[in-house]
């Protein structure tokens, strides 16, 4: 090839589920478009997925349980899917492994030698080997009981592969039940073994409901969405540890003093260039209107922050509506030019004196050089009685 010719950008595949069905889409990054391809069916509803570091395999956690504290099912698995390096197509790879209860989140460690799985009810953290043939393998025996807090929601391994962090949200208080405290459970991590847990829980975990975290790609900064308080907290990593003091606090909502319904901060992703941070705001409460339950109002949006490159402090620079209800998940393409948000359920909304339905689906945004988002299009998806729960993009 003539060295003066520009190389073709690498292809990107997007995967999104409806229940147990996981559909592959080609991603046209330049055109900000998704092209639907084939669908594979997993043993039960997709909960989360994580690619192998080689980007040739996708590990998918599934469950027949309902979300939250809903009815418990009996089918819980991790399945390996092979990613075709040319097309992105998925095919089953080997046998699935059984899990004891519903997995809510999963990741691999940095070299993809082990799979870490978070369970919410009961809260737990388990580690499974990745076999030499890339299939999921046996559980790693731990030295003792694991302190998994209350209602785990995410597990991540620090970029240096030395710590595993279990994000435990706790539960909001109700008129009849006291608040369950939240915490970040930080473990030393080596070869799949978890030891020496440290619990980061400001004020004993009261008014601290963390949901999701992400790491800066080059600096020792960690960003945590506080779901129940609608905040974004910044933590600093020092000498291989996490400083338990909150370095910076930022709002996630555009109108924090004008809450029309329950607001819940959600997914967090740092831009690949490390200059911007993105978080999801979710609302879905309903009110009666003409005998039907309709959306009560609230912020379903992506908040964009500029990151101070000397301190790590995030400053909100944009709040943009996602054009649907409850953006549970979003992801940024590896080139940092596209953001796609997934909405899990259809919702009825008022339209003057009428009622219309906003379908579930995928909203596509361009990311500008200034980090700000521009809405391009939404792909409506008929989920029937199922749920869109996870989506993500993988560079081929």
Give the positions of each predicted feature:
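Surface loop/turn motifs at the tips and blade-to-blade linkers of beta-strand repeat domains
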Residues: 39-43, 95-100, 143-148, 200-206, ...
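Asp-box/WD-like beta-propeller blade repeats and closely related beta-sheet repeat scaffolds
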Residues: 89-159
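Residue-level detector of Asp-centered blade-edge/turn motifs that repeat once per structural unit
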Residues: 8-10, 52-55, 108-112, 159-161, ...
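Short loop/turn segments immediately following beta-strands, especially the blade-tip
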Residues: 25-32, 80-88, 127-137, 186-194, ...
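Beta-rich catalytic cores
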Residues: 45-47, 102-104, 151, 180, ...
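Short, solvent-exposed loop/turn segments at conserved positions within beta-propeller repeat blades
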Residues: 16-18, 67-76, 118-123, 173-182, ...
């Amino acid at each position: 090839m003539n060295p003066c010719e520009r190389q073709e950008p690498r292809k990107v595949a997007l995967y999104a589920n409806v229940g147990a069905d996981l559909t592959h889409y080609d991603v046209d990054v330049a055109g900000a478009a998704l092209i639907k391809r084939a669908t594979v069916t997993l043993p039960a509803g997709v909960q989360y997925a994580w690619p192998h570091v080689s980007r040739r395999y996708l590990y998918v956690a599934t469950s027949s349980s309902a979300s939250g504290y809903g009815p418990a099912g009996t089918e819980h698995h991790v399945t390996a899917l092979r990613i075709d390096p040319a097309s992105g197509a998925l095919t089953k790879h080997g046998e699935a492994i059984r899990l004891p209860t519903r997995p809510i989140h999963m990741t691999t460690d940095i070299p993809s030698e082990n799979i870490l799985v978070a369970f919410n009810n009961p809260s737990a953290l388990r580690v499974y080997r990745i076999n030499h043939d890339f299939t999921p393998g046996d559980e790693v025996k731990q030295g003792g009981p694991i302190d998994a807090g209350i209602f785990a929601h995410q597990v991540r391994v620090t970029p240096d592969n030395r710590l595993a962090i279990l994000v435990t949200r706790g539960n909001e208080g109700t008129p009849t039940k006291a608040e369950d405290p939240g915490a970040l459970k930080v473990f030393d991590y080596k070869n799949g073994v978890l030891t020496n847990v440290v619990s980061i829980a400001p004020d004993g975990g009261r008014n601290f409901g963390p949901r999701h975290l992400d790491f800066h790609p080059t600096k020792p900064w960690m960003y945590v969405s506080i779901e129940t308080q609608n905040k974004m907290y910044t933590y600093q990593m020092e000498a291989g540890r996490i400083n338990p003091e909150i370095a910076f606090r930022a709002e996630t909502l555009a109108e924090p003093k004008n809450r029309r319904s329950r607001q819940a901060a959600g997914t967090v992703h740092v831009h690949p260039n490390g200059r911007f941070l993105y978080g999801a705001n979710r609302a879905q409460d309903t009110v009666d209107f003409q005998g039907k339950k309709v959306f009560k109002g609230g912020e379903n949006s992506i908040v964009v922050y500029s990151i101070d490159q000397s301190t790590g402090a995030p400053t909100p620079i944009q709040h943009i509506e996602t054009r649907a209800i409850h953006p549970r998940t979003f992801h940024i393409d590896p080139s940092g030019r596209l953001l796609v948000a997934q909405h899990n359920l259809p919702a009825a909304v008022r339209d003057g004196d009428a009622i219309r339905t906003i379908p579930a689906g995928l909203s596509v945004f361009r990311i500008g050089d200034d980090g700000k988002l521009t809405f391009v299009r939404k792909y409506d998806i008929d989920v029937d009685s199922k749920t869109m729960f996870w989506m993500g993009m993988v560079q081929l």
